Amino acid sequence: MSKHSLIENLKEQIEPIAEGLDYELYHIEFVKEGKENYLRIYIDSENGVSLEGCEKVSRAISELLDDIDPIQESYYLEVSSPGIDRVLYTDKHLEKYKSYNIVLNLYSPIDKKKKYEGELVDFNENEIDIKVEENIVTIPREKISKTTLKGEL
C-alpha cells in the first residue's frame, strides 16, 4: 500500500474516533526520521488541545491500530496539537484562518523573495492572496512549498 493510500485509509478510520472525543482530525503523517518511523496524528478543537485530550485520543487510536494493523513495520504513534505555528494543509484550514497572518515559503523566488508574510486575504484552487504592508500579493499555489500560520501570542 502506498503512503498516500495508507494515510487516506487511516484518515477514514481515525476521523470518527477523534470526532467522538470532541476533536477534529487536523492532519496525519507517516515519516521516517533516522532509523525510526513515526505516525503523527494532529488533533484540534475550538477549546484547544490538552495533554489529557492527546492521551485519550492516543489510547483510542492505539486500540484501532492494534485491531487493523495497517503498518507492517515498527513505528511510534504521536498524537499532538498542530501548534501555534501550524502548517495550513487544506482549503478548510485556509478558510478558517482568513484574515490571520500567514507565512508562505516558496520553491523558487518571486520578485527575489522565497518567503512572504502577510494577512491571508483570499484563495482559490490556483492562488493565494495575502496583504503585505498595504499591497495585495498573489502567489500561485504551485509555487508554494509550505503555508504556515504566523503564531502570535
UniProtKB/Swiss-Prot annotation:
This is Ribosome maturation factor RimP. Belongs to the RimP family. Disulfide bonds: none annotated. It is found in: Cytoplasm. One of its GO terms (cellular component) is cytosol. It comes from Clostridium botulinum (strain Hall / ATCC 3502 / NCTC 13319 / Type A). GO terms for biological process: ribosomal small subunit assembly; translation. Pfam families: DUF150_C (PF17384), RimP_N (PF02576). Keywords: Cytoplasm, Ribosome biogenesis. SUPFAM superfamilies: YhbC-like, C-terminal domain, YhbC-like, N-terminal domain. Required for maturation of 30S ribosomal subunits.
